[in-house]
């Protein structure tokens, strides 16, 4: 199964997360929803069987490394000033990334 990492579970992410989860079964996706606010990530995951909600501190290099390496694609829903830190890791680990 393809691993999709969505970093950020705020209001603008909810529609994308809902779409990814709705398509996950037929497309073979596991969607990890990562946010500093675990309750927000859990709420966005909708307890879907193909979702995983995690606490995520974008400033924690080790955690970024672990989660990005596990992923096939990374979607950054973070504020624009935080995209660069994620983008650099995606380049280093040769992972696809998109910013929405």
Predicted regions and their residues:
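Conserved beta-strand positions in the Rossmann-like core of class I SAM-dependent methyltransferases
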Residues: 29-32
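Beta-loop-alpha module in the N-terminal Rossmann-like domain of NAD(P)-dependent dehydrogenases
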Residues: 73-90
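Conserved N-terminal Rossmann-fold NAD(P)-binding element of oxidoreductases
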Residues: 4-11
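Conserved Rossmann-fold cofactor-binding substructure of NAD(P)-dependent oxidoreductases
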Residues: 56-70, 82
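Helix N-cap at the beta1-alpha1 junction of Rossmann-like dinucleotide-binding domains, i.e.
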Residues: 36-40
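Hydrophobic/small residue at the entry helix of a nucleotide-binding pocket
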Residues: 12-16
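ADP-ribose/adenylate-binding Rossmann-like module
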Residues: 89-100
């Amino acid at each position: 199964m393809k691993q999709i990492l969505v970093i950020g579970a705020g209001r603008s992410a909810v529609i994308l997360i809902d779409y990814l989860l709705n398509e996950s079964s037929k497309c073979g996706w596991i969607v990890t929803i990562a946010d500093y606010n675990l309750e927000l990530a859990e709420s966005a995951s909708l307890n879907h069987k193909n979702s995983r909600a995690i606490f995520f501190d974008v400033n924690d290099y080790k955690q970024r490394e672990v989660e990005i390496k596990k992923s096939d694609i990374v979607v950054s829903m973070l504020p624009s000033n935080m995209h660069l830190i994620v983008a650099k890791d995606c380049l280093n680990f040769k992972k696809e990334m998109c910013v929405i």
